[in-house]
Amino acid sequence: MGVVAKDTGTIAFELRRHIDGLVYRFDKASDATGRIGFKRSDGDYWIIWHEELRWIAGSWDDEEVFGRPWDQSKRQSETSPPEGIWVSRKGSKSYVYDLIHVETP
């Protein structure tokens, strides 16, 4: 995937699922090769900067996209994913989330 490592100013954010209130936390992290993104706290799930698609939920080494901001017309900074509505796809299901930047202690 056309991914570029970026150092980001945001340290953490949450994806809050509309249908049931489930919250996923993502923290700034780097993978084994030093690529910087945001890793979900409960598994190897990433939100990363893609050179063409901008911020996506996806894999470093695969072209599959699992989620992205709903409003693609919004200007996106390379340093942190945009707050607002995100949508995801898992198999035949889709979910709507709010991405909220959070402060860390």
Located regions from the model:
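Interface elements of modular peptide-recognition networks comprising either
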Residues: 1-105
